[in-house]
Amino acid sequence: MKSPIVDVHSIPVLPEIADSVIRMALDEDMSVSRVARVIEKDQALTARILSLANSSFYKRSRQVGTVKDAMVAIGAEAVRTLALGLCILNVFPSRRDGAFDHKEFWRHSIGCAMYAEAMMNRVSPQLGAKAFCTGLLHDIGKLVLDLTRHEEYRAVVEQAREGSRPLDEIEKELLGTTHAEVGHDVLAHWKLPRLYEESVWCHHAPVQVIDEDQFRISGIVNIANTLTHMTGIGGSGNSYPQLVPGSLLKKFSLSETVLDELMASVPRQIDLICEEIGIGKPAEGLFGLVNRASMRLSEISVKL
């Protein structure tokens, strides 16, 4: 346990289909047919997977009609990751009185996931889907803290809105833990692969003493999280100005030109995905996001 204040028994239980999908994600040798059978046990999940596979995001000329076809069309790893993400998306009901806007939280998480995958495809393509999943889950500890320590976490978020200190610093001071530590424990409780647990735990402070894949994923998610904040995609309670970590950019050979390209293209993709899965469009239009991203790009501070 990384967090001393969250009782794992208070963490929402994963539904049976989610548990099956997690076991499926753990078994990389599972055949396409078996993966398809697991997903097709849940009609709603199947419908959402097919909707995404047929969406304009994947730019397919021909429609797919089965999960197996979707795995062939967009890749088995992509379907596994989407299934896992969609299952977890449904575990936490949105709260109208939440410490933060839960819909905007998921928009931020999806944005981070998509930036992470896009960058990882340039750095280590074999880790692209895992970077997506980690990006999606990187702030899951915030939802658990809002659920289990609601009033205390509301006070944390209210302080963070002032923008004078990072959210995780305020969490540590007021709660004795951080959302990254809680996120680690949530994923451990759900028995997700250890790679995800450790990468979520380290996403604010990637350290190279851990496994190389974990370092790459946590480092890329760190950069992706910054880009998501800079382009104003969703919100997760942190108003502290974000810095692009120059040491990580150098480590992964990512130039500011690459960041420029991503910040110009990824927001449109995020809008498409969010609309497909029912989160809807952001309050600010697409062009507002892109224009603001362009203005902010010139203000990037690279932390050396």
Predicted regions and their residues:
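Conserved alpha-helical "signature site"
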Residues: 1-242
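Divalent metal-dependent phosphate-bond-processing catalytic cores, especially two-metal-ion Mg2+/Mn2+ enzymes
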Residues: 188-198, 217-304
